[in-house]
């Protein structure tokens, strides 16, 4: 700060100008290095935002608004200083009603006091941000003084800093209107059936919520039930209603992908400010947000921060930070040892926070070709849950097994040519060597000469929609919560078939995989083995349900491949079933009078289920009514369902 002290030693900079160092922006954990407030020559309120950097050099990147520079831990990508300063000013303008109402002018810039001017920071690719927030360099102390004096002529006699810190928080109409216009007509975010029920229920709870009447909605749903579709619609609608809301997720990938899809004409920072990680609420004042929409809530942790040493409980902290919280959760997608956010724990925590709680379930299946049967078959085959879905038909879902990983890759690449919505993914059984050595490959299967790199840092969290990322292989962290048309899955040696059992082997995971690190600490061997089995099987269940139209698989363990093949319906079996004559069924009435329901008639459901236990996400809908005879007294709990087997 000594550099700024020297800058401010100018008689024409008013001594009573407002100064703030390390100012924390409301709604965020972001801090502005240096702020100067005052009035310009016509008595208008002014705020100069200065981003300070100690850098002495930087490198270009091919990513928007990013440069590379050296930190203590080495060279890494970071935001361009002008982008940072501009983004802070934009965030305040977008969400501070007082700043907008009183027309307080925010003027950002950057000061790199150790940096000799070159063609990197001022490169034309950064021009949009340099125009908004000019950078000043080692030799520009005089220019920075003139810049400050241009905007701050008189001292701060109007408590401008107080208005920024304590002003009314409300998203701007421009931000809301732009967001709504981007969602309109976007087929990807149209809600159907029970998605609409959850959406309207959530809005009703949001309207009821207040600081002393917290509302918590817990929405359970399996893969492809549209949890994220509802979440994004709620984010847009609450912003349209000028409520302070945010989409929250533990993983960066869903945030980055949905933000990119919604960006449209908005500048990147404006849309990204509406998305945040789950580890930023441990010091957020109570009820700062009107609404927090938590997607993939099963991934929430206890501790936050890079070293997991901040905060106490992300579920409790999120509930405390908002008047209303909507949690979207799938209890079968816990894939990390530190994941705590199952529905039971969320409900228990919400009760301890004295919140009003409602629970709903999304059941309609939009992924996996709309087949609940595929999910139930998968649970049965992975031996997660016993269901009656022993065999899988190609009519249910396009599931194929490949004996050669190269053929699998070629098939996925061919599928991807249509719309860039097919990718290869794998279990984390291979070290990420290419992170340090760009020439190295990661996922290697020597018997077939197969070699691919894990998803590179180039696309980062948006790997799944990257233009050229088809040539890289993704892992659970870059695809969970997102969907593809076709998923090519490589199942590593951490999942095997032995003695009639699908077994897991945590020792086959990469040593770089943090999801199972420390699994033996504080647990008996049996407890550790049980948890490892749950995490590994949940990981593959998640990978195997990313494809909406098809899933193609290669197994490193050949006994496991043979076992999976045995669970597929053979073509001759299918032909045998199809050749049977259609039985004459009873007459189905579309509707009957209420006075004969459950007296003479029982409801018929559409689900053609195997006899036995149904999968958790298998749902039935009423198709009509059938008259019954010889069954004795009927009750309202009875129904008719067509069964195969």
Which ranges hold each PLM region?
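Short, positionally conserved secondary-structure boundary motifs
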Residues: 576-644
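N-terminal pre-P-loop "Q-motif" helix
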Residues: 172, 187-215
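Conserved RecA-like ASCE ATPase "motif II neighborhood" in helicase/translocase motors
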Residues: 264-320, 471-474
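Conserved helicase/translocase motor-coupling segment
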Residues: 231, 336-341, 355-374, 383-501
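Signature of the SF2 helicase/ATPase Hel1-core->accessory helical subdomain module
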Residues: 293-362, 499
